[in-house]
């Protein structure tokens, strides 16, 4: 699980992320759709998936908002994301592999925006955090 | 695998910006730190337990360069990647006994190193092209497993 050192590193870089959550969220999603186009099947109702799409911007804010909540509740990510897990598990029926793909795209966005801060140690801490998020999202699937 | 002119140009443009020994070493460093179980294949390299130890380990730099040199060959032979990696695939299966999942992990680390080097220049489209390149290499390396 997350060590005290991990939590410090996660909160530290997230402080920088919080200054531009919408931009980073949009970038992560655009990277997801370009690199892993199969993920677009869950967004037929968006019609426009370009970086200027209003719906995409709104969704990016929702996603990053949930991640920020998780960062603020690192000791209880499972409960924090319970309702979001239910939506993905029962309503949206999103294949969980997509959480890993979006996680990777978010890490690429962080590495591109915060090159000097995204050290191997910070990379490890964020990767561990996103794994906890993925587990929490999968919690209500079956 | 079909490569468009844009993809070919994108691959070459990014490649020209890279310092191969640096990128190779940094990708392996992230692999060993973020996915520490991958060190199982490198017991002969000595201490790989921390960023500091890995950074000063000449065997890591040497191996990183080996990997990047092979990737260079792939980049300059995009239409023959399967053949190019035939022997290396056999070696990883029969001799080195490497779980192919490790190829995917190293690919993820390499893309992240590219992001730290290129910043905004690693646009979603550029990333997509390099993800495609690495997935083709990974498939070629996994091909002779049976």
Swiss-Prot record, chain A:
Red blood cells. The keyword Kinase does not apply. One of its GO terms (cellular component) is blood microparticle. Keywords: Heme, Iron, Metal-binding, Oxygen transport, Transport. It comes from the Eukaryota. InterPro entries: Globin (IPR000971), Globin-like_sf (IPR009050), Globin/Proto (IPR012292), Hemoglobin_a-typ (IPR002338), Hemoglobin_oxygen_transport (IPR050056). Residues 1-142 form the Globin domain. Belongs to the globin family. Involved in oxygen transport from the lung to the various peripheral tissues. Heterotetramer of two alpha chains and two beta chains (an easy dimerization is also reported). This is Hemoglobin subunit alpha. The gene is HBA.
Curated annotation (Swiss-Prot), chain B:
Keywords: Heme, Iron, Metal-binding, Oxygen transport, Transport. One of its GO terms (molecular function) is heme binding. PROSITE patterns: GLOBIN (PS01033). Red blood cells. CDD domains: Hb-beta-like. It holds the Pfam family Globin. Heme b binds at residues 63, 92. One of its GO terms (biological process) is hydrogen peroxide catabolic process. It comes from the Eukaryota. Gene3D superfamilies: Globins. Residues 2-146 form the Globin domain. One of its GO terms (cellular component) is hemoglobin complex. Heterotetramer of two alpha chains and two beta chains (an easy dimerization is also reported). Belongs to the globin family. Involved in oxygen transport from the lung to the various peripheral tissues. PANTHER family: HEMOGLOBIN FAMILY MEMBER, HEMOGLOBIN SUBUNIT EPSILON. This is Hemoglobin subunit beta. It comes from Latimeria chalumnae (Coelacanth). The lineage of its organism: Eukaryota, Metazoa, Chordata, Craniata, Vertebrata.
